[in-house]
A protein has these predicted regions:
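Glycine-rich Rossmann-fold phosphate-binding loop(s) that bind the pyrophosphate
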Residues: 42
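HTH-adjacent hinge/linker in prokaryotic transcriptional regulators
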Residues: 1-37
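Short, solvent-exposed amphipathic alpha-helical segments in soluble enzyme
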Residues: 53-57, 116-119
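Phosphate-bearing ligand-interacting subdomains
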Residues: 76-165
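NAD(P)-binding Rossmann-fold cofactor-contacting core
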Residues: 56-78
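Short active-site oxyanion
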Residues: 36, 62, 98-100
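Hydrophobic/small residue at the entry helix of a nucleotide-binding pocket
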Residues: 45
Length: 166
């Protein structure tokens, strides 16, 4: 029933052809298109994301990193060039990038968000624990490792209690 909204025709009591369904879902989810993104904050987490080639399988290609640390600006991390944050607006305009990945320190999160929105970014993948504020048309996807860590601890506690009760 959940798949009744797709434009594919399934067969009664048989379902959908697997290959066609996978192709349709990949297209629908945007995995078949190439979405270029800039990464802001090339620290430990940012560097890890730059090195993650698996993101390309899902249509995301990080084409540049931005930071303020002089020791990293002008270098490449996993083949991705790192620029000074002062070049951000110019490069967003020149390259037409609409997606930014935010991995900056907590105290910089909202300021950097405001700067990205002013420069034309339309979607933010936010890895900071800060719930950033943006104007309505800007898409924000919050990914909090801390929230997921708390969830894991809660699930572990529940599982361990279940073991004791069994």
């Amino acid at each position: 029933k959940d798949l009744s909204y797709v434009e594919l025709q399934g067969r009664t009591r048989v379902g959908y052809e697997t290959e066609a369904l996978i192709s349709y879902l990949e297209e629908f989810l945007g995995f078949t298109q190439r979405h270029h993104a800039f990464l802001i904050g090339v620290g430990s987490l940012g560097s890890g994301l730059l090195a993650d080639k698996g993101l390309r399988q899902f249509g995301l290609e990080i084409t540049a990193g931005f930071d303020v640390a002089e020791e990293i600006v002008g270098t490449e991390v996993a083949g991705v060039p790192v620029y000074h944050i002062n070049e951000l607006a110019t490069r967003i305009e020149a390259e037409g990038v609409q997606i930014a990945i935010l991995t900056v320190p907590i105290l910089q999160a909202q300021h950097m968000t405001d700067r990205l929105v002013r420069a034309g970014i339309r979607a933010l993948w936010n890895f900071t624990p800060v719930r950033i504020q943006t104007p309505e048309p800007v898409v924000v996807q919050n990914t909090s490792m801390y929230a997921h860590l708390a969830l894991m601890f809660t699930r572990l506690k529940s599982a361990l209690q279940g073991d004791r009760e069994a």
